[in-house]
Amino acid sequence: MKNSINGFIKNHLKVKVLYGNKDPLMKHMMTSSRLPHIVCSDGFEMSVQVGSHLYSTPKKVAKRYSAVEIGFPSEHEPLIEKWAENLFEDTPDFTDTVYSYVPVKVVNQVLKKHGGIDLTETLRRYKEVA
């Protein structure tokens, strides 16, 4: 798939080492990772993040992820609804929540549904806030 989330992560994940600990077992716990906020071709937006303190699998920097954390989509997206943290609230706001451990397969379906990642717009906005 041209717009797979794993491909996007591979090309755009920024990792910063926060602590110079030489212990290789601690390395993944002392990093901060960040991905650009995704803008799709139809205007749908969402944050997708991976890393040691996030709802993603695996927890370390990896070549491929099986599940990612999604945050604050621009509109209610039924494909990811069941992973919403606030699903059991009386009136959940699906645009104001985090979605934990969303399978990559589902994220790719969301991207396809919304026309794929508009990489030009995604990176333009990322440069504005970086």
Regions found by a protein language model. Name each.
Residues M1, G7-F8, R125-V129:
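Glycine- and charge-rich intrinsically disordered segments
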Residues N3-M26:
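Surface-exposed intrinsically disordered loops and tails
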Residues N11, P24, Y55, L119-T120:
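Intrinsically disordered, low-complexity, compositionally biased regions/tails
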Residues L18, S41, Q49, E69, ...:
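Intrinsically disordered, low-complexity segments enriched in small/polar residues
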Residues D23-S66:
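Amphipathic, interaction-prone secondary-structure segments
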Residues I38, I70-F72, V107:
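Generic structural hydrophobic/aromatic packing signal, biased to beta-strands
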Residues S52-D93:
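Acidic, aromatic-enriched beta-alpha/helix-loop junctions
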Residues E77-A130:
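Low-complexity intrinsically disordered segments
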